[in-house]
């Protein structure tokens, strides 16, 4: 189980999460915004805009660097979450195995920024097999699968080194129409812990 406190930045692995109607509590609760008010995401950032972005190691340094450039730094809480689509993303182990076969190498699942990673579900081979399905996680949580996730350039970044591998997105586009994983909406909120079963209702 993973949570990403700041959209498009590294996530954290958790053994227990609280799922609210709007998704995992604390997930993508913040985003970096540019002056236009748009969220700064991995889709737009290529690491070339300003080399100083790579040298900021703590909050004080970041604020000082912004002040030197005459940039106003402020916090806003206008949106509860910054999702691309739905509040929960799910990846099944067989889908990861298929992506690894297509790409010809081992892939860290964190590259795809899922919230939930689960084992195989009976009768489910591709994302399309799960569309519209209701899922039960643990004793209480219920989710509905809404759509397959169409992947963007973010998956080309290694989650540890930030090294870029464009071949991953190309391979997924050729054999999977660039889709990997599914989005889910929350039907019944609750708490789930690592190891809770995920079942099709």
Predicted regions and their residues:
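Metal-cofactor-dependent catalytic cores
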Residues: 1-201
């Amino acid at each position: 189980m993973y949570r990403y406190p700041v959209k498009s930045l590294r996530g954290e692995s958790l053994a227990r999460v609280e799922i609210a109607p709007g998704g995992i509590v604390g997930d993508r609760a913040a985003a970096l915004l540019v002056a236009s008010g748009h969220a700064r995401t991995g889709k737009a950032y290529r690491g070339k805009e300003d080399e100083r972005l790579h040298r900021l190691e703590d909050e004080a340094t970041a604020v000082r660097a912004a002040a030197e450039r005459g940039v106003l730094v402020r916090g806003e809480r206008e949106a509860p979450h910054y999702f691309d689509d739905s509040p929960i993303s799910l990846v099944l182990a067989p889908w990861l195995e298929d992506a690894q076969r297509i790409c010809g190498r081992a892939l860290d699942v964190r590259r795809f920024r899922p919230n939930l990673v689960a084992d195989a579900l009976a009768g489910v081979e591709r994302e399309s097999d799960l569309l519209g399905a209701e899922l039960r996680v643990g004793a209480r949580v219920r989710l509905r699968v809404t759509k397959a996730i169409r992947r963007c350039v973010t998956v080309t970044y290694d989650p540890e080194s930030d090294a870029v591998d464009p071949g991953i997105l190309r391979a997924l586009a050729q054999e999977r129409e660039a889709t990997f994983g599914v989005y889910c909406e929350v039907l019944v909120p609750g708490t789930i812990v690592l190891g809770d079963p995920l079942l099709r209702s």
